């Protein structure tokens, strides 16, 4: 069994920080603020990324993929979720971008 090494590109790491900020802003604007939301977000991302260590090809092919190595991981979270765009190169899974499904530029 191949164990893949998961690597976050700098852009993807920046995306995750931006998504945390986005999540905090949405939560602070809600009527019932939940301060544990960021911890749960991080846990959801960590769990999902661990899947890529063992089974990256179980994720869907990217919509505009140039080859079968470009994939998307759906990360369920709350009423929406996140999409992590990644590419498999040998035994390395490189995550290039992460988007929240409620962001304006998601579509």
Predicted regions and their residues:
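Basic, Lys/Arg-enriched alpha-helical interface segments
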Residues: 1-71, 77, 106
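Enriched for short, Lys/Arg-rich terminal
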Residues: 74-107
């Amino acid at each position: 069994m191949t164990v893949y090494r998961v690597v976050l590109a700098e852009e993807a790491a920046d995306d995750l920080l931006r998504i945390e900020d986005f999540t905090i802003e949405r939560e602070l604007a809600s009527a019932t603020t939940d301060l544990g939301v960021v911890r749960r977000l991080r846990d959801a991302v960590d769990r999902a990324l661990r899947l890529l260590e063992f089974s990256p090809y179980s994720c869907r092919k990217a919509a505009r993929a140039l080859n079968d190595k470009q994939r998307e991981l759906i990360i369920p979270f709350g009423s929406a979720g996140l999409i992590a765009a990644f590419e498999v190169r040998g035994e390395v899974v490189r995550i290039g971008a992460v988007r929240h499904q409620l962001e304006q530029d998601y579509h």
